[in-house]
Amino acid sequence: MLGQLQDAGNTTTISNYLNLLDECGLLASLSKYAGDEARTRASVPKFQVYNSALMNAYNPLRFKAARTDTKEWGRLFESAVGAHLVNGADKGNYEVFYWREGNEEVDYIIKKDGKLVAIEVKSGRRSTNSGLSRFRETF
């Protein structure tokens, strides 16, 4: 991540801005779950809004149009689940991560008391969970 931030400008400034957005309850920065602290810290973050209404306020699609667009609806649904998870992390005393390896991913990884729960969000009936299988094999 630092390499990407250096290309964008001062890493300390960007890091401070991201921290301020997190402290204000606007944007959480989820680390990639990697199994060890060094690889987790070096990962590119996945950004998650604390309130999905902020995302929807700037969405040009109205509810009915978004609901019929399966890709857009899936994105909104995943964001709503993520918002719920990051908002509950402090009270639930857990950490929220994501995981991705190549084309396989798991939307959210919950870590509490050394135990992991992998969550793949699907808004429709069709489901491919190769990411869950790969995550289970790896960790």
Residues covered by each model-derived region:
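Active-site ExK catalytic segment of metal-dependent nucleases
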Residues: 114-126
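Accessory nucleic acid-recognition modules appended to NTPase machines
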Residues: 1-116
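Catalytic cores of nucleic-acid endonucleases
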Residues: 123-139
